[in-house]
Amino acid sequence: LKKINEEFDFFNNSKIVTIDLFGHTPGSIGLLVNLDKNQFLIASDAVSLLRNLEFEEVPKNAWNKAELLKSYQKIKKLSQKKINLICGHDYLQWNQNFKLGIEYN
């Protein structure tokens, strides 16, 4: 088990990198996934709903408002690079953009 304090590159090839997204909880992290044709940021609870980021809404259960707003800015900066953001609890985002289960052909 490795304690992660800053960015951590799992395979030393930039394919999966953690980024700190403190605010929701003291040690919140996101996963930046770099594929050949797309990039994704799995934000987990750092951005529960896309509207939280768009309107800089801080959920009531956030540990530290100032840190969460810093994380929002970091995510917005990454989003300028056309990274696909995956929110932790946004049913509308998941329902409109992602498959919700396994599809068999």
Where are these predicted regions, by residue range?
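Divalent-metal (often Zn2+) His-rich catalytic cores of metallo-beta-lactamase-fold enzymes
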Residues: 9-12, 33, 39, 50, ...
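Metallo-beta-lactamase
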Residues: 1-20, 63-82
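Short polar/acidic secondary-structure junctions
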Residues: 22-23, 34
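Active-site-proximal beta-strand elements of phosphoester/diester hydrolases
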Residues: 16-22, 41-44
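A generic structural motif
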Residues: 26, 37-38
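Active-site metal-binding loops of divalent metal-dependent hydrolases
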Residues: 24-25, 45-46, 89-90
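A hydrophobic, small-residue-rich beta->alpha segment in the mid-to-C-terminal subdomain
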Residues: 43-67, 71
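Loop/turn-rich, solvent-exposed surfaces of beta-rich toroidal or solenoidal domains
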Residues: 28-30
